[in-house]
Amino acid sequence: METFLFTSESVNEGHPDKLCDQVSDAILDACLEQDPESKVACETCTKTNMVMVFGEITTKATVDYEKIVRDTCRGIGFVSADVGLDADNCKVLVNIEQQSPDIAQGVHGHLTKKPEEIGAGDQGHMFGYATDETPELMPLTHVLATKLGAKLTEVRKNKTCPWLRPDGKTQVTVEYKNDNGAMVPIRVHTVLISTQHDETVTNDQIAQDLKEHVIKPVIPAKYLDENTIFHLNPSGRFVIGGPHGDAGLTGRKIIIDTYGGWGAHGGGAFSGKDPTKVDRSGAYIVRQAAKSVVASGLARRCIVQVSYAIGVAEPLSVFVDTYKTGTIPDKDILVLIKENFDFRPGMMSINLDLLRGGNYRYQKTAAYGHFGRDDPDFTWETVKVLKPKA
């Protein structure tokens, strides 16, 4: 049997880049909660003892940016300098201006356009992907790497492993076979975890706890065998982490946010962007389209691309490829997609309820992936049943 290896990585919520994504989306949540028409393009950067938020926001909401920054960092677990950042004593810098009036008139006509008329906030192309290899219809490498990261945070916060600190990275290599275009996982080849820890714990204790409390509950036993390789904190020491260890920026983890290197990516990041930014809303709707194709039994694996021009409502192109796994021709699947999904930005906002913020709605997306999540707030994960015409 001919097989191949494929690898996906993840980082958990204490990684400095992910801290920035969460701050940007916490600010988006706060704006949309009070004013669903908020136009938000919020970037965050961080380094030792400092978090800065900057960008363009036009909103009627009253938002305490500094409080949101501190609350978000504290919620992650950055409560003292020795864990990488002290949420209550770090410097918070804010440099936020209004959205450019040139962009405003072209995209939403200074809020005068009807939903079906609202143009894309920028040019770009986005991809959605789905595969039948997991119940989530997501790649197994990505699902396992992401769940390992989430479990690391869980056992840190519930004190199962009190030596854990917020920063951490995971990576999973899976051996696959190609079944006429569909991906079939055979086994987990390698598991890599690098996690921040306190000064007191030994490397043996780290390895033992990670195997028992993180790997065992996450990776199904059927995928592990005596040949599975484990690299657990292979550098030997990871005490300094978070923004103290390295700088962080919003939008630096776009593959972790999506499909772990499978499918394709148009390059646009998600966090800190309101739904007129098609980098986000366009990527969400093509995930729904690709997932619906696979869930409806029309293909075992599917990728969908959409593209836009700034200020233009209708997409420039829509593309689908089922990697030769389709039960009907791709051209017929494309017709079904165009009939069932409205790719105009204003209509995506309505159909996926994307103008609703608050209650951590977008902040939740900013760690552990935007896709394959079982949460009603992730409206783009709802399957539309696609029926080919008789």
From Swiss-Prot:
Induction: By salt stress, ABA, and mannitol in roots. Repressed in leaves by the same treatments. Pathway: Amino-acid biosynthesis; S-adenosyl-L-methionine biosynthesis; S-adenosyl-L-methionine from L-methionine: step 1/1. Disulfide bonds: none annotated. CDD domains: S-AdoMet_synt. Its cofactor is Mn(2+); Mg(2+); Co(2+); K(+). L-methionine binds at E56, Q99, D246, K277. Keywords: ATP-binding, Cobalt, Cytoplasm, Magnesium, Metal-binding, Nucleotide-binding, One-carbon metabolism, Potassium, Transferase. GO terms for molecular function: ATP binding; metal ion binding; methionine adenosyltransferase activity. The keyword Ribosomal protein does not apply. Binds 2 divalent ions per subunit. The metal ions interact primarily with the substrate. Can utilize magnesium, manganese or cobalt (in vitro). ATP binds at H15, D167, G168, K169, S235, G236, R237, F238, D246, R252, K253, A269, K273, K277. K(+) binds at E43. GO terms for biological process: one-carbon metabolic process; S-adenosylmethionine biosynthetic process. One of its GO terms (cellular component) is cytosol. It holds the Pfam family S-AdoMet_synt_M. PROSITE patterns: ADOMET_SYNTHASE_1, ADOMET_SYNTHASE_2. Mostly expressed in stems and leaves. It comes from the Eukaryota. It is found in: Cytoplasm. Belongs to the AdoMet synthase family. Homotetramer. Catalyzes the formation of S-adenosylmethionine from methionine and ATP. The reaction comprises two steps that are both catalyzed by the same enzyme: formation of S-adenosylmethionine (AdoMet) and triphosphate, and subsequent hydrolysis of the triphosphate. This is S-adenosylmethionine synthase 3. The lineage of its organism: Eukaryota, Viridiplantae, Streptophyta, Embryophyta, Tracheophyta. The gene is SAM3.
